[in-house]
């Protein structure tokens, strides 16, 4: 039986094959993307492709630059042709929960800009509904994080935790906290997102709704492609 890393590796080649010369490419964040970036660099240099990368996190930018991928600031490009990223959950409508790596705001900016957004995932990420197995990350301002948490908990039997890293609060690339929200039952993601995004101090939620074009899934039986239904 293949482990999670092996399943992720299976998805990478299909994603790299979608790269074309002269693209502005959105490069995501997380363990799957860290497997993708070296393969991406290999193809760019082997075929001498002109690729401009915009990265969803400082970590991804560091890795890409180290492999001599041309990386620029998001404000230096007018569009993104293709964005490739991972996901923490994928539901039956290929809506997502993202943000396990703490980069959800920048991920959403780039993924929404992209003409085409492709997600890489192993089969363990496929769920019946969002929040079934992974906590929903919400990026919040440090100033009033505790009060935001209480308002989130008041919504509908939700448990929040401020994300920690090495016994100190995790800080995003934007200088904010992450609240991880445990949903104890199925909740309408559109309704909950609207509630959250209007709370003062909330920067963004980990719901990625109606923006995914394709999911490449690594399974024990091979690669499965799920395309957005028209």
UniProtKB/Swiss-Prot annotation:
Pathway: Carbohydrate degradation; pentose phosphate pathway; D-ribose 5-phosphate from D-ribulose 5-phosphate (non-oxidative stage): step 1/1. It catalyses: aldehydo-D-ribose 5-phosphate = D-ribulose 5-phosphate. The active site is at residue 107. One of its GO terms (cellular component) is cytosol. The keyword Isomerase applies. GO terms for biological process: D-ribose metabolic process; pentose-phosphate shunt, non-oxidative branch. It comes from the Bacteria. Homodimer. This is Ribose-5-phosphate isomerase A. It comes from Staphylococcus haemolyticus (strain JCSC1435).
């Amino acid at each position: 039986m293949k482990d999670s890393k092996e399943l992720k590796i299976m998805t990478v080649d299909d994603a790299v094959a979608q790269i074309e010369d002269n693209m502005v490419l959105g490069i995501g964040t997380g363990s799957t993307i860290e497997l993708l970036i070296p393969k991406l660099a290999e193809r760019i240099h082997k075929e001498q492709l002109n690729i401009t990368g915009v990265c969803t996190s400082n970590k991804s930018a560091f890795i890409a630059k180290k492999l001599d991928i041309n990386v620029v600031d998001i404000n230096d490009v007018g569009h993104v042709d293709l964005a490739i990223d991972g996901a923490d959950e994928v539901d039956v409508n290929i809506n997502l929960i993202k943000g396990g790596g703490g980069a959800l705001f920048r991920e959403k900016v780039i993924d929404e800009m992209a003409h085409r957004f492709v997600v890489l995932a192993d089969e363990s990420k496929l769920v019946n509904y969002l929040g079934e197995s992974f906590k929903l990350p919400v990026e919040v301002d440090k100033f009033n994080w505790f009060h935001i948490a209480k308002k989130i908990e008041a919504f509908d039997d939700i448990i929040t935790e401020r994300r920690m890293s090495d016994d100190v609060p995790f800080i995003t690339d934007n200088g904010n906290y992450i609240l991880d929200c445990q949903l104890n039952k199925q909740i309408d993601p559109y309704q909950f997102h609207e509630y959250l995004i209007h709370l003062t101090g909330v920067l963004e939620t980990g719901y990625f709704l109606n923006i995914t074009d394709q999911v490449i899934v690594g399974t024990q039986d091979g690669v499965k492609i799920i395309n957005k239904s028209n």
